[in-house]
Amino acid sequence: IVPFDYQQKIVGTIHKWLGNNEIHDKISLYSFSWLLGGNMIVDKGYNFSKGATLFISFYENKYLKVLIDTILSDPKMFCGLSVKEVTFEREPAFTEEPAFFRLATPIFIKRLIEENGKKEQKFYFYDDRESNDLMTETLKHKMREAGLPDDDTLKVEFDLSYMNKKKKLVTIHGIKNKASMCPVIIHGRPESKLFAWTVGLGNGTGISLGALL
């Protein structure tokens, strides 16, 4: 049985596979999903009797090579799970048309703001009007960090027509945060959409949040 708050175990496993390198100190140009394919057991956790799938994507291929080499020599994960097979997913072919994305993990948006002379963290969700601009701003910042050209047509927005959108409580490293489980629509150049699909959206993609399917 894998506990409900296993997400921090995935983070620890991926960092173990990556080893000691500068990726931990840089802005996260990678994203990864939670475990897919399990059955929930009430009050206990998840059962992966038929195995689980985990998606990991990096903008910089050198880290992918490090990850795969390490997995092959050390496939053990946690709670009795270990990697049995590594496969490569073909990159989607995007066009200039708006692209719709489902989420592999919820999108987490936060900013440090000053109110009444005091700085504090503010969190944003799919029903906050600022959220679309903040997701777009973060993605553009990551594109600049990656050395990609600016995309003035880039716009990220929550698909508010989705009926089952919700706010989800996520616990990582003992800290509880709420994030948005709601699909997104991305406008912009095909390269920008591919970049978003690779690195994820919002804050915390390096700790398993904001991964796209």
Model features per residue range: what roles?
Residues 1-213:
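RNA-interacting cores
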